[in-house]
């Protein structure tokens, strides 16, 4: 039974159905997949558990040269054999945590992120089963954990700072979350944190307790507007 006293399965289905309906309003498909950048994709795995929606995160292995020990979503660079950007995200999720493509229902592709003048990261939100047991690849992943989606709107520990990149000011959120299962505290920041905030707002439709990058009244248009401005600046430097 759920905390509401209702059977778990109907509660999960209701949560996921509502999430899908809201996310699909923000699906841009392959609108920007033609842009000439180095292509990366990430998967934001969404799971309904104990009457709440959660996001699944990984902690990068300390053995990795780039960003060791940082919290992120499963993802990586596109391979020539990947059919599209979504295939990249699914392949990387399988390699990193053992999540097979048939275990994911990809719901939407969000507005991509430009992290420098030549690297485009495309985020996908996918639903996964509440019974999924992660199998971290120790060469790439140190740990896997879940965070309630609502935490990214009303956190216990949050900070933010501003950075200027490609001629535009960006908000970088920094969250600290202590996993109640083992007491481990994780820091979630940068693009990963920003995407978590965006997805939480889209699905839960509640105002966050802090400033955000996007316009709360027109999330999609404001996200695309900023992306296109940064894209224009990036291409002018090539």
UniProtKB/Swiss-Prot annotation:
A motif (Microbody targeting signal) lies at residues 236-238. Keywords: Hydrolase, Magnesium, Manganese, Metal-binding, Peroxisome, RNA-binding. It holds the Pfam family NUDIX. It catalyses: hexanoyl-CoA + H2O = hexanoyl-4'-phosphopantetheine + adenosine 3',5'-bisphosphate + 2 H(+); octanoyl-CoA + H2O = S-octanoyl-4'-phosphopantetheine + adenosine 3',5'-bisphosphate + 2 H(+); butanoyl-CoA + H2O = S-butanoyl-4'-phosphopantetheine + adenosine 3',5'-bisphosphate + 2 H(+); decanoyl-CoA + H2O = decanoyl-4'-phosphopantetheine + adenosine 3',5'-bisphosphate + 2 H(+). Expressed in liver, kidney, pancreas, pituitary, small intestine, spleen, heart and placenta. Weakly expressed in brain. Residues 37-172 form the Nudix hydrolase domain. It comes from the Eukaryota. Its EC number is 3.6.1.-, 3.6.1.77. One of its GO terms (molecular function) is coenzyme A diphosphatase activity. Fatty acyl-coenzyme A (CoA) diphosphatase that hydrolyzes fatty acyl-CoA to yield acyl-4'-phosphopantetheine and adenosine 3',5'-bisphosphate. Cleaves CoA, CoA esters and oxidized CoA with similar efficiencies. Preferentially hydrolyzes medium-chain acyl-CoAs and bile acid-CoAs. Has no activity toward NDP-sugars, CDP-alcohols, (deoxy)nucleoside 5'-triphosphates, nucleoside 5'-di or monophosphates, diadenosine polyphosphates, NAD, NADH, NADP, NADPH or thymidine-5'-monophospho-p-nitrophenyl ester. Belongs to the Nudix hydrolase family. PCD1 subfamily. The modification N6-succinyllysine is found at residue 20. Its main location: other. SUPFAM superfamilies: Nudix. A motif (Nudix box) lies at residues 77-98. The lineage of its organism: Eukaryota, Metazoa, Chordata, Craniata, Vertebrata. It is found in: Peroxisome. GO terms for cellular component: cytosol; peroxisomal matrix; peroxisome. The keyword Metal-binding applies. This is Peroxisomal coenzyme A diphosphatase NUDT7. Monomer. It comes from Homo sapiens (Human).
